[in-house]
Amino acid sequence: MSFMDNLFNMADKKELKKFNKTVDIIDSLEPKFESMADSELKNMTNIFKERLANGESIDDILPEAFAVVREVSKRVLGLRHYRVQMIGGIVLHQGRIAEMKTGEGKTLVATAPVYLNALTGKGVHVVTVNDYLAKRDRDQMAKIYEFLGMSVGVIIHGQNPKVRKEQYDCDITYGTNNEYGFDYLKDNMVIHKEQRVQRGLNYAIVDEVDSILIDEARTPLIISGPGDKSTHLYSDANTFVLTLKPDDYELEEKDKAVSLTASGIQKAEVYFNVDNITDISHTELYHHINQALRAHVIMKKDVDYVAKDGEIVIVDEFTGRLMFGRRYSEGLHQAIEAKEGLKIQRESKTLATVTFQNYFRMYKKLSGMTGTAKTEEEEFKAIYKMDVFQVPTNKLMIREDLPDCVYKSEIGKFNAVAQEIIERHKVNQPILVGTVSIEKSELLSQILKKKGIKHEVLNAKHHDKEAEIIAQAGRLGAVTIATNMAGRGTDIVLGGNPDFLTKREMRRNGFKEEIVNRVDTPIEGIPVKGNEILFEAREEYEKLFEKFKQQTQEEQKQVVEAGGLAIIGTERHESRRIDNQLRGRAGRQGDPGSSRFYIGLDDDLMRLFGSDRISGIVDKIGLEEDMPIEHRILSKSIEGAQKKVEGKNFGIRKHVLQYDDVMNKQREIIYAERKRVLEGEDLQEQIQSMTHSIIEEAVTLYTQDKGFDEEGFKEHMYNLFLPKGSIEIPEIEKLNPVEITEKVYEIAMKIYTSKEEQVGYERMREVERVILLQAVDNHWIDHIDAMDQLRQGIGLRAVGQQDPVIAYKMEGFDMFDEMNKHIKEDTVRYLFNITIETPVERKAVVDVENLSSPSDGTLPTSKTVKKDEKVGRNDLCPCGSGKKYKNCCGR
């Protein structure tokens, strides 16, 4: 235990003592549960539930529940939770973040807190970054839960609402952050409560929590419908930008911002034949020019995006993966399409949106696990109220982290990287090289090809076999080049992964992909008849697995002798956490390994945020292209630059959250109103209250200093909802405002009661629900757009010495108030004027069930959009108005 003393500060050590006492209790229970028969062990779930029903808390039964899970895992998986894995489980149960190094078995760690919290019957969500991991983790860990009588579901792309509801109704559900978030939005667009699939947000464990809650924090999930704006301005702006020279615009690389200079503005005014392009009347044109500028000056092909099959596909800056189905917002995507000469797609209209920050903060309890979180603890505490506990490793970490090598230029740096690869390759040491972009990975690949080094390249262009390539990166002599953290979630096992090798061999032997994917899942209860091929494949799998297991164990010894996995970073990322993730691929479970970063002074981080002192040192030394430099000041400057960027990015995310919180509060109010309507609450009193309020406001409006404007008031009420000639009140001019309000309200209620008698009581209540839902949805969609436009222009308030956030809150509140007024007026107007000839049906503003999800992955600087709704521009609007969509909700 002495090495732990060096790893943890006093606070951590104090807490670790407490955790160890709890784990001692869990360990002491092991003999008791070991001696139980399977049936007795299975019955523990019923016993625990009974104890909870009798007043005990889940904290009370934690030691026993954890001990039960450990014993079941031994029996069904052959895996026994280490003490440190039990500590990790306790941290997760407490609603905190467990930082556990790569290879420490985070998937298994989650099983104990998942089971414990699932005993409440309120559901547990396990969140992963992609469908592959969600399904893999569900299939592997379901054996434990199902043994204990728990149902386990998985939410993946493409499932229909019926299947999704079944998965959410399980005790435990695995899925991706995107699928959970989009289902939440869709549940708040349905028009019957039975169409909702989620059953509440109780407890979530987020795997790779830093990726989801930090890297993707600013990513809004958006469900959208087709817009109505023309695309010609994108082409015009693109053609104009091609005429500009560098002096016509100013680039702020640090902030990734670009704007026209005075000469650029003058050229734009001449080109588009306008007097003052910055005038409010030319806002849209100026916006298109700015987006075209961004597309040409800031957005780089094969770094930020790729052009594939006639479309622009975003590249995730953190993983290097292609983000199919994702589009940049605010016209940037269209500007890039124009730049690349592709067909320009129309901008869409937002129907519903939420950020990951606000979605995950809705869970009653939230926890997470990752290999790298401590550097972002301040942000986790500030935004999510979660602290980070560094769980000790099961075995002592012996990886050698070598000092950075700094070179004057990129050419010198990459030549040095290639030379180190050659030297390590001579002894067959496996090497994983991390690059920051597709462009850089292909540059290094070309250098290695010229030097005759066989290697694998894993980037957004070659992502098909990502998991397999990463899993085999620990084989003898393997050289793998990967962009950033591609393959995250897949362990690199020294000597190779026998499971992947077995499945590859089976594919070569002619087994179909669907069969290969099922060979290692439970087959208990599956009849032999009709599944002969599966049983044959299972036998083949077990035979081949043993063969490859022996082979990889032999190879592992050779890899260890060669020094383990060598990690080479070709550039420092702007976040220390991303660098630590790359380092963390080596040295798992006490394996040997090494890591080193190579840095060029012209790397983005050094060029934009590095200290001027570095340039001074280099100039004094007279550094050659291929001469490395090591200096204490350099190391401090690099770390200082990273801290500077991390602080800046945290500030941006915090600032964005201030704005998003305004919209979030409004969303909560609207969704709560929808929920009330959906769940069948009698709206009669609310409709009466709305009617009274409208009349009262109108009376106030037409009662001024000169007295009551009777004619103006009547005309206003007839235009709103009352039949012409219905307001006949003797000597109305002698009544005070309160009396007028009550008299007109009596008239309105008689008319409404008469309509209700014609329609029938129950039917009228359903009509009220239908009308109110449609009014809420239609106005909410327009309000989202209006708030978005307000937010885009609010920054200018700073010029007038007004805090933009405060201005946004105040004006947003006024707009929300105005929206509620319109909802009220529309609801009452439609109800008083509706003629019911056919049975009333609830119709959604958009066909939620037919929305298709994009594939996994998101990008923080883009809006994540669900596309391919079935509502066309010229289709009848689904709200039931009888108008075309483009002239109604699609306006």
Swiss-Prot record:
Organism: Clostridioides difficile (strain 630) (Peptoclostridium difficile)
Cofactor: how and how many bound: May bind 1 zinc ion per subunit.
InterPro entries in the cross-refs: Helicase_ATP-bd, P-loop_NTPase, SEC_C_motif, SecA, SecA_CS, SecA_DEAD, SecA_motor_DEAD, SecA_preprotein_X-link_dom
EC number, UniProt record: 7.4.2.8
EC supergroup of this enzyme: translocase
Protein name per UniProt: Protein translocase subunit SecA 1
Keyword DNA-binding appears in the UniProt entry: no
SUPFAM superfamilies: Helical scaffold and wing domains of SecA, P-loop containing nucleoside triphosphate hydrolases, Pre-protein crosslinking domain of SecA
Reaction(s) this enzyme catalyzes, per UniProt: ATP + H2O + cellular proteinSide 1 = ADP + phosphate + cellular proteinSide 2
Compartment(s) of residence: Cell membrane; Cytoplasm
Cofactor(s) in the UniProt record: Zn(2+)
Subunit structure: Monomer and homodimer. Part of the essential Sec protein translocation apparatus which comprises SecA, SecYEG and auxiliary proteins SecDF. Other proteins may also be involved.
Keywords of this entry: ATP-binding, Cell membrane, Cytoplasm, Membrane, Metal-binding, Nucleotide-binding, Protein transport, Translocase, Translocation, Transport, Zinc
Membrane topology (UniProt): Peripheral membrane protein
Record GO terms (molecular function): ATP binding; metal ion binding; protein-exporting ATPase activity
Keyword Cell membrane: yes
SMART domains per the UniProt record, alphabetical: SecA_DEAD, SecA_PP_bind
Gene giving rise to this polypeptide: secA1
Pfam families assigned: P-loop_SecA, SEC-C, SecA_DEAD, SecA_PP_bind, SecA_SW
GO cellular component: cell envelope Sec protein transport complex; cytosol; plasma membrane
PROSITE patterns with a match to the protein in the record: SECA, SECA_MOTOR_DEAD
